C-alpha cells in the first residue's frame, strides 16, 4: 500500500466515523451544538425576523491577526470561489486579506490550494444548486489530500437547512461559518487545522461593525466600499433579511477615510455598497445623515468616479437626487430595481410602492438629470402573476426606457411568505415571459448603444479583453463596456475612445491619441 492509498483509507475511516457519529445524533442536537445560543433550530422565519430589536451596534477598530496565526499559512495557498452579489465579492476581498496576513498566498488552481472557501449566495435556488455541485466535485480532492481545508461561508451558511444537509451528507467539509463572523476567520482556520470535527460557527445575531479588516482588492483601478450591512425591507420573496440581518450603517468618517485612502493608492473609481444602499444612515440616532449627505461629502474628494448600488425606490429621496444632479465624479448611471410593473404584484411582494410612484420617481430623476441612464432588476412568474400583470411590466420597461436589466424567473426561498403561496403559473409560461422580456430589454439596449456611434466617450481601462488579449476593455461613466486597441500602459487610466461599432451589450472603438486623463 503506497502513501496516497494510506491517506485515502485514513480519510475514509474518518468520514465513516463522522457518519456514525451523526447517525447517532439528532439534527436538532447537532444544530444546537454548532449554532450560537441566539440561534433557534428552525428554518428562517420572517415573522420572527420582523420582531428583531434594534440593538446598539458596536464599532470595533482593534482587529488583528493573533500572533500564533501570523505565519501559519507560510508556504501554503488559498482559493476562494465567490457566488452572488457585489457584497459577496467584497466579503471575499476581506477573507483574502485576512488569509494573506496569515501568510497564505492566493491561487486560482484548485489542486494547488491548501484552503478552499466557497462564499455562497442564497438569493435563488440555482445559486444553491451550483454550490452543492461544487461541494460534491471537491470530495475526490479531499480524499487525495486529507490535509486540505474546505469551508462553506456566505449567505447559504445562515440557513439551518443548508447546514443540516452538509452535516448529514458532506462530511468532507471542514468548516462552516456565516456572514456575521468573517472577522473570526483566523480562529476558525486554527480550529479546522488542529481539530478533529467539522467546525461550524454561524451567528444568527447580527455582527458588530469591524472597521479595520484587511482587504485584498483586485488591482488598483476600481474598489468596493461597503457603507452598510443588512436589510429591513422584508420583500416577501427575499431571504436577505434573514441571511444578512438588520440594517447597520458605518460611520461617515470611517467611509470617507477609506475613500481617501483608496485615492492615495491610485484608485479611479469606488462603488458604495449596501443591500439597500440608500437606507444608509436611517439607523443613526445621534445625527441626521443619509446617503445624499455621504455622496455630497465624497463628491468633494478627488476621485474620478463614484457609483452606488443597490438602491430601493422606497428610500430614493429628493436629497439624494439633488446631490447626484451636481454631476462631476457622481455618475448618473442609476440602478433602480423595480421587480414588477404591476401595482398588484408589487403589493404582494411588499415593495411598498406602486407602479405610479415608481414612475414619478423616474420623472424626478429625469428632470434633475436628463441624461441619466437607468437599469433595473425584474422578476417574472411571481406566484399567480396574470398575463395582464406581466404586460404591465413590459409597458413599464418601455416607458422608463431601461438600458439594461437583470431578469429572473421567480425562485421560491424557504421561510419567505411568497414560498407558501400556491402558484398556478405553468413553468413554460414563465419561461416564455422571461424570453419576451429579454427580447425587449435587448432591443432597448441595442437602441441605446446606437446613439454612441461616432461619438467620443471616456473609458476607465480595466485590462485586456476576455476574448482577445490584443484588445483592451473598460467601462464608460454610464457603465457601457467598450473594447478598443491601445497601449497596455493605458490600463488603470481614463482615456478617450471614439466609437466605431455598436453592439447590443458593448461598443467597439479606437483610442484617441494623447487623451490619457488620469495617471
UniProtKB/Swiss-Prot annotation:
Region annotation (Disordered) ranges: 1-23
Domain Radical SAM core: 217-450
Record text on cofactor binding: Binds 2 [4Fe-4S] clusters. One cluster is coordinated with 3 cysteines and an exchangeable S-adenosyl-L-methionine.
Cofactor(s) listed: [4Fe-4S] cluster
Keyword Flavoprotein appears in the UniProt entry: no
GO cellular component term of the entry, any: cytosol
Residues holding [4Fe-4S] cluster 1: 85, 121, 155
Quaternary state and interactors: Monomer.
Role this protein plays: Catalyzes the methylthiolation of N6-(dimethylallyl)adenosine (i(6)A), leading to the formation of 2-methylthio-N6-(dimethylallyl)adenosine (ms(2)i(6)A) at position 37 in tRNAs that read codons beginning with uridine.
Similarity section: Belongs to the methylthiotransferase family. MiaB subfamily.
Name under which the protein is recorded: tRNA-2-methylthio-N(6)-dimethylallyladenosine synthase
Organism from which the protein derives: Oceanobacillus iheyensis (strain DSM 14371 / CIP 107618 / JCM 11309 / KCTC 3954 / HTE831)
